[in-house]
Amino acid sequence: MIILLDLNGTIATDGKIKEGVKERLTILKERAEIYILSADTSEL
């Protein structure tokens, strides 16, 4: 299984990982490949 996650707005706010996300991702990585995507759109 592959999981794609967006950084800002999904697992983080203002570039800071939300509380509890790291622990959940640690559990999920045993069952899936996890990819975190990000795009710098602040200048658009």
From Swiss-Prot:
InterPro entries found in the cross-reference section: HAD-like_sf
Protein name in UniProt: Uncharacterized protein MJ0072
